[in-house]
UniProtKB/Swiss-Prot annotation:
GO molecular function, one term: structural constituent of ribosome
This protein's name: Large ribosomal subunit protein bL28
Species whose genome carries this gene: Alkaliphilus oremlandii (strain OhILAs)
Phylogenetic placement of the source organism: Bacteria, Bacillati, Bacillota, Clostridia, Peptostreptococcales
Regions that span the bilayer: none
GO biological process: translation
InterPro entries to which the protein is assigned, alphabetical: Bacterial_rp_bL28, Ribosomal_bL28, Ribosomal_bL28/bL31-like_sf, Ribosomal_bL28_bact-type, Ribosomal_bL28_sf
SUPFAM superfamilies: L28p-like (SSF143800)
Homology family: Belongs to the bacterial ribosomal protein bL28 family.
Gene behind the chain: rpmB
Length: 63
């Protein structure tokens, strides 16, 4: 299962952590995903959605 939002396609991002002594260490940032039941094409389906999509109302939740 890929750590990607199925609504906005937000995924893993890589970059550097920079310490006070200016050392650079590679790391990754992963999106804050939730597995929710949502209405997709008229049927309820479990999808991975980032919390920004949930808060902004881009996902119609299935109850």
């Amino acid at each position: 299962m890929a750590r990607v939002c199925e609504v906005c396609a937000k995924g893993k991002v890589s970059g550097n952590v920079v310490s006070h002594s200016n050392r650079h260490n590679r790391r990754t940032w992963e999106p804050n995903l939730r597995r929710v039941r949502a209405i997709v094409n008229g049927t309820a389906k479990r999808i991975n959605v980032c919390t920004r999509c949930l808060r902004s109302g881009r996902v119609e939740r299935a109850l």
